[in-house]
From Swiss-Prot:
Residues 520-537 have a biased composition (Acidic residues). Residues 538-551 have a biased composition (Basic and acidic residues). Coiled coil: none annotated. This is Capsid protein. It comes from Torque teno canis virus (isolate Cf-TTV10). Residues 489-576 are annotated as: Disordered. The lineage of its organism: Viruses, Viruses incertae sedis, Anelloviridae, Thetatorquevirus, Thetatorquevirus canid1. It is found in: Virion. Residues 562-576 have a biased composition (Low complexity). Pfam families: TT_ORF1 (PF02956). The keyword Iron does not apply. Self-assembles to form an icosahedral capsid with a T=1 symmetry, about 30 nm in diameter, and consisting of 60 capsid proteins. The capsid encapsulates the genomic DNA. Capsid protein is involved in attachment and entry into the host cell. Its main location: virion. Belongs to the anelloviridae capsid protein family.
Amino acid sequence: MRFRYRKWRRPRRLFRSRRRRGYARRRWRRRAWGRRRRVRRYRRRRGGTKRQYISSIMQWNPQHRHLCYIKGITWLCAARADRMSWPGIKQIAATDSTRYWSTILVGGCGVLTLSMDWFFFENLRWRNRWSHSNVGYDLARYMGTHLYFPPLADIWYIVWTDTEFVDQPKKVMSYTHPWILLMTKKHKVIKPRKWNGKGKKIFLKPPAVFNSAWYTSDKWCGAGLGRIYFSFLNPFKQIMHTNQTEQSFPFAIELGNTDYDKPPNNSYDFKDTNEVKKVWNTAGKKYYYRADWDTGDGNAIMLPNTLSPTTPASWLLLEWDAPYWLWFWGKTYQDFVSSHTPEGNPYYGQIYVKWWPITNPYDQGPHTYPEDKEWCLMMLDPQPNFMTCNSIAAALKIAAFGPCVYAPQDTQTSQIPINIPMYYLSKWQWGGSTQGTSTHIDNPCNPRPKSIQIADPATAPRDVIHPWDVDASGTISTAKLKQLMEGLGYREPKPKPGPPETLIPPGAPTPELDYYSSETESDDFDTGDSEEEEEDHQDPRWVRESLDKLTRRLRGERRQRQQLGKGLLALLKEKK
């Protein structure tokens, strides 16, 4: 049945509608079948389980506290075209005999570890500012750091942060590879301004091991607060790079002994460049490498330790089931040469690897069995006076031609060098049992760049006087006095050689008594004269005189200590 919609409006009703009746009144009456049960107004406990009550965690806080914001700018790296796979930063931890050090290298990847040492080191280089001085505060609490990575003009880069780590930075350089960072959770890709890219913000929470607790500032030194993994990212040329016609490229030559279990046997005269060049140009002698075929299964490296490496003991064997483009990432020439330099051998920089005998650049495989890999010598086109570093150059080329890496020919001259800046804001809180330093007022007639006096966090607790360092009379303890003297550059002299320490014989003068006996006598500081003592020491009058002399002597020693403490405090104020 077909329905039709009305095209005309129904006429309005003219008659008056019926008046609406009112609501019926509700009549209440008592139930006839008994009284209602009393309502339970308390919460019933769940059977079998005890309810968990959430309460606030109370922790101790020092009496005097002050917030401090550390705001600054730094650089992650400064790279050029041929060093995109080299490390771009170097950090050396402080020891008992050396201070902390951090510097920027010419490279395109690296790991930056944030710490209290790094923040203070950056302040010494005029790269950050502290909103409040830490002078007078020996406790510190960390509350996190905000990071900002601005976009570059036309270069991509990738960043990843971590607060829970245990390995050393040199052992985690493989995590800075752009292909690995792309598969890491919570990574940040900073697109260039050419592609309408915007900067990325990251907040580094305090590590879980610290739990927002108070520690002395020297304990924060050397403790890693977070790590920043960074590298440049090439999203457009992942496999084939500029001027490449095939995915593969020659990187090694065939050896005489290709046994899988034995070390390679050098059957070529590498001192003769022309002979090696003939082998290089011979068909079937060059091996080709493809990054997309390298799974890492069965890969191995050998480095010579002696002048004539003919036995297994004369080689250093390294095995790691990782592709070579990841193995050689973050390496420099010194990483291959520094610890393997046979004295007197100009051709020590030889690297032997295991790879499939791929002699055709148009080979399409399959190559899936690691047992088919053979030893080969890494080498590029042989050139005179370049044989020492030829194998190392081949290894660095493999790293530079890896996935998502900027090869030397992928960048233009106008883009080099490339710098990656980083802005940060770190929040701290200083604390202590005594009030910290007051605001310093500079001379307005001789203006200087405004700054806040900052003490080295590693030595700040040493220069702070706590209530427990002073006794009831105001005298500084011996241990604290020694620390204050060390802050002024004083070092305790070495004791003179003498007889072993024994009990002082009766009647022998002590150095302390001799010092005070040389002072002039006064009314309230009497050291006593060498009078003849009475034979009868049981006389009460003699006992009272001896006690009176001893009391005056102790009073004088206390006064000398107080004067010495005031003098040291004055010297500390002048030094600050």
